Design a protein with these regions (language model features):
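Short beta-strands and strand-loop turn motifs
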Residues: 87-89, 113-120, 148, 166-171
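Gly/Ala-rich phosphate-binding loop of Rossmann-like dinucleotide-binding domains
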Residues: 33, 139, 245
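Conserved phosphate-binding/catalytic region of the ribokinase-like
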Residues: 155, 183-285
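Hydrophobic anchor at the start of a short beta-strand
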Residues: 37-40, 64-65, 145, 200, ...
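Conserved phosphate/ATP/ADP-binding segment of small-molecule kinases
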Residues: 129-215
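Conserved N-terminal subdomain of the carbohydrate kinase-like
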Residues: 10, 34-114, 280-285
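Glycine-rich phosphate/adenosyl-contacting loop at the front of the ribokinase-like
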Residues: 1-42, 50-52
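Short, small-residue-enriched loops and turns at beta-alpha junctions
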Residues: 93-96, 122-126, 153-155, 174, ...
Length: 285
């Protein structure tokens, strides 16, 4: 939702509205689809908003495997853009113990070589250590697991050696309990590798991103008008994974990750392959 002016306590009218199906996991699935890879969105839906989410996810050519809750309704989150972007996120339904058990049943279908992306915040009723519990449950099955969550959650999964984590500078500070300055990002990304992460992709907004594993890789961000920040980080995750699945080296994977994230930021919605390709060619020429 975009506004020309905003006055607190008064009637305000928007000049542009757009309704998108969202959630970090769904954003990653849509981005993967745009890059030619099919994935299965997992998670919970509830109420009439849950029905609409399923409908819209299916409209992207995806086949969701959601668990339908019998109470509450899936969240409606508002992104309001005036001088700055303001977010209002609803609470959403509570996930009960039996609902969590249903998700573990679905995880049993994963097999060697699969990739599982654990993305976003915990629903009400879900333990803070849930992602770590999932990784422990799947340990030894040769499944690559990606975790994109707040810093405190990322810290819990490191002992299980996630294939990829994607913190930003603020989340690095959260993980280590101290302010991480821009010039310290590389140092602390390397610390995460030593703590167990296989790949650490740090998004730095308009300054690009860096990738840490056994080496360090850097990529500057292309210039452009930011129209939408929603899904940019999720697009980065998708592009990195597709590049690695295609057998490309780490520097190219980082560059394509930044290109996809930037292309999404420069458009309304998750960027399409064509827009990403154009931007990537401009970045590397």
């Amino acid at each position: 939702m975009q506004l020309e002016t905003f006055e607190e306590g008064k009637l305000n009218r928007s000049i542009f509205e757009q309704i998108d199906v969202g959630g970090k996991g769904i954003n990653v699935s849509v981005a993967l689809k745009h890059l030619g890879r099919i994935s299965t969105p997992l998670g919970y839906v509830a109420g009439f908003t849950g029905d609409e989410i399923e409908k819209r996810v299916s409209s992207h050519g995806l086949i969701p495997d959601f668990i339908k809750l019998d109470h509450g309704q899936s969240r409606i989150n508002i992104k309001m853009k005036h001088l700055e972007e303001t977010e209002i996120n609803a609470s959403g339904p509570t996930v009960e113990k039996e609902d969590i058990e249903k998700l573990y049943v679905k995880l049993e279908h994963l097999s060697e070589g699969d990739i599982l992306i654990l993305s976003g915040s915990m629903a009400s009723g879900v333990d803070h250590n849930f992602y770590a519990d999932v990784m422990k449950y799947l340990e030894g099955r040769k499944i690559r697991i990606v975790v994109d969550a707040v810093g405190s959650v990322l810290k819990t999964v490191l002992p299980y050696h996630p294939y990829l984590i994607k913190p930003n500078q603020y989340e690095l500070s959260e993980i280590f309990g101290q302010e991480v300055l821009e010039e310290q990002v590389e140092e602390y990304a390397c610390k995460l590798v030593s703590m167990g992460a296989q790949n650490v992709l740090v998004s730095l907004g308009t300054k690009g991103a860096l990738l840490a594993n056994q080496k360090i890789f850097h990529c500057n961000a292309p210039s452009g008008e930011v129209l939408n920040s929603v899904g940019a980080g999720d697009s980065m995750v998708a592009a990195f994974l597709v590049s690695k699945l295609n057998g490309e080296d780490d520097q190219i994977a980082l560059e394509k990750s930044v290109a996809m994230g930037s292309a999404t930021a420069f458009s309304y919605g998750i960027a399409e392959q064509e827009a990403v390709d154009i931007l990537y060619k401009e970045m590397v020429k």
